[in-house]
From Swiss-Prot:
It comes from the Eukaryota. Gene3D superfamilies: Exo-inulinase, domain 1, Glycosyl hydrolase domain, family 43. The keyword Glycoprotein applies. Glycans are attached at residues 168, 236, 248, 567. One of its GO terms (biological process) is carbohydrate metabolic process. It catalyses: Hydrolysis of terminal, non-reducing (2->1)-linked beta-D-fructofuranose residues in fructans. This is Fructan 1-exohydrolase. The gene is 1-FEH. Its EC number is 3.2.1.153. One of its GO terms (molecular function) is fructan beta-(2,1)-fructosidase activity. Belongs to the glycosyl hydrolase 32 family. It comes from Aegilops tauschii (Tausch's goatgrass). SUPFAM superfamilies: Arabinanase/levansucrase/invertase (SSF75005), Concanavalin A-like lectins/glucanases (SSF49899).
Length: 596
């Protein structure tokens, strides 16, 4: 069926007629829901894959995302703000673009946008970390003393926690770190512990008894757990007889994160400071290749996290990001009184592509993260500093999108862009019915009800990184459903036609969020496009999706298109659309550049 319609693609030279809001002519296509073929560009299957050109090795490197100049990177580790400088530590392979030989890379910044790359902060040079300096955290002790606690692996791959201090705290960059002579300071001792599943310590916090607390990801008697430890001095740790929280229906929890949040207040909270009345806590874990979380309270009497809602089926747990995003780490930014979170976005091309490129992995744009006013979910938004890269703004108002309409967003660099668009629903009467079972696998639903399948309200959204003839394009869009007395919005990022290149992962990512359409008819979408990295924020940050895309058009042609579209029965208005070309940031460039 896919190839049966591929022959139609050559006639769709969109540049010849997509110069206004509407298509002047159509080609009938029953696969497009009988709409006269207006949405053919969304439903026609791409022709056979083609091999990448030699330019692939350079064209997919991002312009304003955090990544080292070369080689492999993965988890963010120990981000902090200290003495006027932001520090980003990260898992790094000095020797190549594949996983292995992991050390702690280290970069510094004054604005979270431009970064200076330094020598690694931690390398594998002691018996307790010879297998790798794995993920960890930074805690700033009283008196302004930062301390790293990280997981090390020994020659037998047993895991334990280690400590390191800055050699010279007067150095603004904190270039050199000294490991504690008594490392490791914490081993997986005790009944029911698994010595090869004991890693990724959190930032520490002080409890009501004045003792430090810390959680470590692990397994306890076969349960996944955020194991809880106490210390008077941050050097000598004692295991608490119960975990901070555990669950018997999931895999081992990596990279746990624990922090306080105030409903409806985007100000950050320092977990070691006095927590105000009404605050909630978030417990995040990396599991099943994604980052999930729970909202609840930290019961000081029990010294335990208590979720507001206990959900046994982990497929229903909330997600930080519904795309290629893992091993996130947050920190309290005392500079601007906010909590910031980073995540690792892996490559989804082939290992041979990574070897050709000479690099693999990046970190998402730093995001402010806070709790929604109803206390049910976390919201995220790119830090305001990233807007300093905006240039060449274009703006449109009062656009009306009927079924099958495209509107081209011109005069911005389609490979490096920031697009903010607001969709206003003329009516909500046409919303299709919601099936609660879709919550178990929103990605599957995005794949089945793609942008080519018309609905009552939606799909509507953006088509990005589109080639001239639309044989390559990525769709980021919404669908609206009615669920009893509320409305559910599905946000999708569909990569299935994103590239003609072979050996790529091209899924359809997706997530649902509740939205009170009786009160507010406007749904916002912000998409940041940075060559092979796309980050989208729907409904004011209710759903976030990070995607990795590798269109051949980027390497072969050097131009692409961005469109707003609607393929639903209900008319959608666009009261405001703004887009900017994004300038290149200075990220871990060659020595000699300095912004400090």
């Amino acid at each position: 069926m896919a190839q049966a319609w591929a022959f139609l693609l050559p006639v769709l030279v969109l540049g010849s007629y997509v110069t206004s809001l509407f298509f002047p002519s159509y080609i009938s296509n029953p696969l497009c829901g009988g709409d006269g073929g207006r949405s053919l560009f969304l439903c026609a299957q791409a022709p056979k894959d083609q091999d990448p050109s030699p330019a692939v090795s350079t064209m997919y490197k991002t312009a304003f995302h955090f990544q080292p100049a070369k080689n492999w990177m993965n988890d963010p580790s120990g981000p902090m703000y200290f003495n006027g400088i932001y520090h980003e530590f990260y898992q790094y392979n000095l020797n190549g673009p594949i996983f292995g030989d992991i050390v702690w890379g280290h970069s510094v910044s004054t604005d979270l946008v431009n970064w200076i790359g330094l020598e690694p902060a931690l390398v594998r040079d002691t018996p307790s970390d010879i297998d790798g300096c794995w993920t960890g955290s930074v805690t700033i002790l009283p008196g302004g003393k930062p301390i790293i606690i990280y997981t090390g692996g020994d020659i037998d791959q047993h895991q334990a926690q280690n400590i390191a201090f800055p050699k010279n705290r007067s150095d603004p960059y904190l270039r050199e770190w000294i490991k504690a002579p008594n490392n490791p300071v914490l081993r997986p001792d005790g009944p029911g512990m698994n010595s090869i599943e004991f890693r990724d310590p959190t930032t520490g916090w002080i409890g009501p008894d004045g003792l430090w607390r810390m959680a470590v990801g692990g397994e306890l008697n076969g349960y996944s757990a955020a194991l809880l430890y106490k210390s008077e001095d941050f050097l000598n740790w004692t295991k608490v007889d119960h975990p901070l929280y555990s669950h018997n229906g999931s895999n081992m929890w990596e990279c746990p994160d624990f922090f306080a949040v105030l409903p409806g207040n985007n100000a950050g909270l320092d977990l070691s400071a006095a927590i105000p009345q009404g605050a909630k806590h978030a417990l995040k874990m990396s599991v099943d290749s994604v980052d999930k979380y729970m909202i609840g309270v930290y019961d000081l009497q029990r010294d335990a996290f208590v979720p507001d809602n206990v959900v046994d089926d982990r497929r229903l747990w909330l997600r930080i990001d519904y795309g290629t995003f893992y091993a996130s780490k947050s920190f309290f930014d005392s500079n601007k009184n906010r909590r910031i979170i980073w995540g690792w976005s892996r490559e989804t091309d082939s290992p041979s592509d990574d070897l050709e490129k000479g690099w693999a992995g990046l970190h998402t744009i730093p995001r402010t993260i806070w709790l929604a006013g109803d206390g049910k979910q976390l919201l995220q938004w790119p830090v305001e500093e990233i807007e300093s890269l905006r240039t060449n703004e274009i703006s449109h108002q009062g656009i009306e999108l009927n079924k099958g309409d495209l509107f081209e967003i011109k005069e911005v660099d389609a490979f490096q862009a920031d697009v903010e668009i607001v969709f206003e629903l003329a009516s909500i009467d046409d919303a299709d019915s919601f099936d609660p079972s879709w919550l178990l696998d929103p990605e599957k639903h995005c794949g089945e009800a793609g942008a080519s399948v018309p609905g009552g309200i939606g799909p509507f959204g953006l088509v990005i990184l589109a080639s001239d003839n639309m044989d390559e394009h990525t769709e980021v869009y919404f669908r609206v459903y009615k669920s009893q007395e509320k409305y559910m919005v599905l946000m999708c990022s569909d990569l299935r036609r994103s590239s003609l290149r072979p050996d790529l992962e091209k899924p359809a990512y997706g997530g649902f969020f509740e939205f009170d359409l009786e009160k507010e008819r406007k749904i916002s979408l912000r998409t940041l496009i940075d060559r092979s990295a796309v980050e989208s924020f729907g409904g004011g940050g209710r759903v976030c999706i990070t995607s990795r895309v590798y269109p051949a058009v980027l390497a072969d042609v050097g131009r692409a298109h961005i469109y707003a579209f609607n393929n639903g029965s209900a008319t959608v208005r666009v009261p405001q659309l703004s887009a900017w070309t994004m300038r290149k940031a200075q990220v871990n460039v060659e020595k000699g550049w300095s912004a400090i």
